[in-house]
Amino acid sequence: MIIPWQEIAPDTLERLIEAFVLREGTDYGEHERSLEQKVADVRRQLQSGEAVLVWSELHETVNIMPRSQFRG
């Protein structure tokens, strides 16, 4: 189930995005990006609709994923 990011308290949304970014592991790109930059990127993706917050009833967890990968 998609959770509208606009309905999440700002502090909670920030923590969800940070947890997601930290779970993603090491960035092997040419230039290392800070946590703040990565969080800002994910926030922009949520705002643009490119990414969505998803609640898994099976696992009772929240995840962030590309909208194109969501199979609701």
UniProtKB/Swiss-Prot annotation:
The Swiss-Prot or TrEMBL record describes its family as follows: Belongs to the UPF0270 family.
Name this polypeptide is given? UPF0270 protein ESA_04379
Disulphides: none
Task: Quote the InterPro entries the UniProt record gives.
Answer: UPF0270, YehU-like_sf
